[in-house]
A protein has these predicted regions:
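Sec-dependent bacterial lipoprotein signal peptides
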Residues: 1-19
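Extracytoplasmic copper-binding redox domains, predominantly the cupredoxin/blue-copper superfamily
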Residues: 21-264
Length: 264
């Protein structure tokens, strides 16, 4: 009887050990402790630090508005001194273009809280048409290239005045239809023509992913802005600069009005 009992005990122990081994073999392998490589942000996307003031995952909204001038303003004209067959006799002064209801054209609006990394993939065009820079104010992202065209077929001279970017002064004769320059740092840059002294324009190099230039009715619009609280800045070559706080809510339109008076 004792031998029989010993044999049964041995069989029982072997069965238990076999069951334990089977369970160990079916367990999932342990996860590696090595870190997962980070995914690089898409070119031109706002940086992580730039999004600190927004609410990721909470949606986007829109910012619209107008820039208005309060006060009286006389419409100015600029006489043309040469090449009148192309330039004409005179033109309206573009440095302060105001509509009948005070609408301010060519004001630059941007969200200053948000930044994006430079991207050399962006290109913009600044043309010279009837001895005017078109557009009068051009906004580009940091790292962009500007193609300066000469649609007039006469001699022009493109002369920039800047502090952070390399200034250039290049003749553009009628056969040179295009020249290109890259702007690597955020800055407001004045553009002049030494041949035609009345020609003036601006290149605004912005590191914000959200900017606009007001149209003739003084309006601007920014779409797909992440939810959050921001500082909205407006700049105008004659009226100056001011800021205003805004809050963007998911699926909503935030309307903002900027009012200027003539600086004393």
């Amino acid at each position: 009887m004792s031998a029989s009992r010993s044999f049964k005990r041995l069989v029982f122990v072997l069965l238990v050990m076999a069951a334990g081994c089977s369970k160990d073999e079916t367990r999932a392998p342990a996860k590696s402790s090595e870190p997962t490589p980070a995914t690089a942000p898409a070119p031109g996307a706002p940086t992580a630090s730039a999004r600190n003031n927004s609410s990721p995952g909470q949606g986007v909204g829109m910012i619209t508005g107008k820039v208005i001038f309060k006060g009286t303003h006389a419409v100015g004209k600029v006489p043309m001194g040469k090449d009148k067959e192309v330039c004409g006799d005179s033109k309206f002064d573009p440095t302060l273009a105001i509509g009948s209801q005070g609408e301010v054209k060519n004001a630059v609006i941007q969200i200053v809280d948000l930044k994006r990394p430079p991207s050399s993939a962006n290109e913009a065009v600044l043309d010279q048409v009837k001895c005017e820079y078109v557009p009068h104010v051009l906004v580009i992202p940091v790292g962009a290239t500007v193609k300066v065209k000469n649609s007039d077929g006469i001699l022009h001279n493109v002369h920039t005045f800047s502090e952070k970017n390399i200034a250039f002064n290049r003749a553009q004769p009628k056969y040179m239809k295009e020249i290109s320059e890259k702007f690597a740092k955020p800055e407001v840059i004045s553009v002049r023509c030494d041949v035609h002294g009345w020609m003036s324009g601006w290149i605004v190099v912005s590191e914000s992913p959200f900017f606009d230039v007001t149209s003739a009715d003084g309006s601007f619009k920014m779409e797909n802005v992440p939810v959050g609280k921001y500082t909205l800045e407006v700049w105008h070559e004659t009226l100056g600069k001011t800021t205003q706080s805004v809050e963007v809510n998911a699926g909503e339109v935030t309307n903002v009005t900027f009012e200027f008076q003539m600086r004393k």
